[in-house]
Amino acid sequence: MLGINYKPCNEDFWQGRTDSEENFLAFRWHQWIKPINLNKDDLSPFTGKLGFAFIGFCCDEGIRRNKGRTGAAKGPETIREEMANLPCCFTDEVKLFDAGNILVENISLEEGQDLLSKAINKILSLNLFPIVLGGGHEVAFGNYLGVLSHLKTINSKPNIGIINFDAHLDIRPYTEGMGSSGTMFRQISDICKKEDLNYSYLCMGVQKHSNTLELFKTADKLGANYVFAKNITYGDNWIVFESLDDFMKAQDYIYVTVCSDVFSSAFAPGVSASQSLGLDPEIVVRFIKYILRSNKVISFDIAEVSPRFDQGHVTANLAAVVIFSVIDTIAKIYGLGL
């Protein structure tokens, strides 16, 4: 049981246009989404060809600890609103489920991340692909822990690679038990060291002006890989693709996480730390699709959508389109795309 800080799907968020109530080719996501309550003990594993489960992580405590601009706790609501009208560009054998939200209210960040970990573990055990809606980027720690917990039932030492699209390395120092939205991948490194696991971390879109020299030194010490945003924007992308290939070949599983501050503020103004020289979303989506085609991706999240700063839901809409691209790409991999 996930307790009172888990709230099952609120179907009111899934409202939109209806062109037909019978013709699936005219359906939008709000007509196809099904609620799923992770607190139920009698849930049977999904036996269809391909299923996705959305879960929101309503939290910005990590952002507050990181002295950023709070507001991302409301992100999952607005992302759902933007996803509601997306078209079903897949066959009816692809199923979409909404698993509700983890609410980090009147509990610690660490308790919230533990709840998310349990939720991700359960979603994976149901044979569904988790897509987490943030929430601060502290969502990454809970998502990773859930993936790790699930994979340990298969292999005591799973080989998981992390690909993070982010302007920040997020490997800041932290006090034990007091992480933030800037510490997750250092926390994961410490877990890997403690449990003798492989630590494979690649950060795409790093901004030199957003990280201290000590953080780059720490990344090198930890064996982390990173690609600067300027090298993606102005460099030879084939070199970047080769770097991705080298990284992905060494992994058995890949967890992909996107911090919305990787994007230029022209496309993503509603974030904790906006980036005037961030990446063009078209480039990021191109890389995400390439990574998905490795067929190793086990979980995905997009974080730091902050409605408080998001005039016209521009950033939430971008997050929805990124998620659309993820589902569209995986559906095509399974031969279920239209």
UniProtKB/Swiss-Prot annotation:
Mn(2+) 2 binds at D166, H168, C259, D261. Pathway: Amino-acid degradation; L-histidine degradation into L-glutamate; L-glutamate from N-formimidoyl-L-glutamate (hydrolase route): step 1/1. Its EC number is 3.5.3.8. Catalyzes the conversion of N-formimidoyl-L-glutamate to L-glutamate and formamide. Its cofactor is Mn(2+). The keyword Translocase does not apply. One of its GO terms (molecular function) is formimidoylglutamase activity. Mn(2+) 1 binds at H137, D166, D170, C259. This is Formimidoylglutamase. Keywords: Histidine metabolism, Hydrolase, Manganese, Metal-binding.
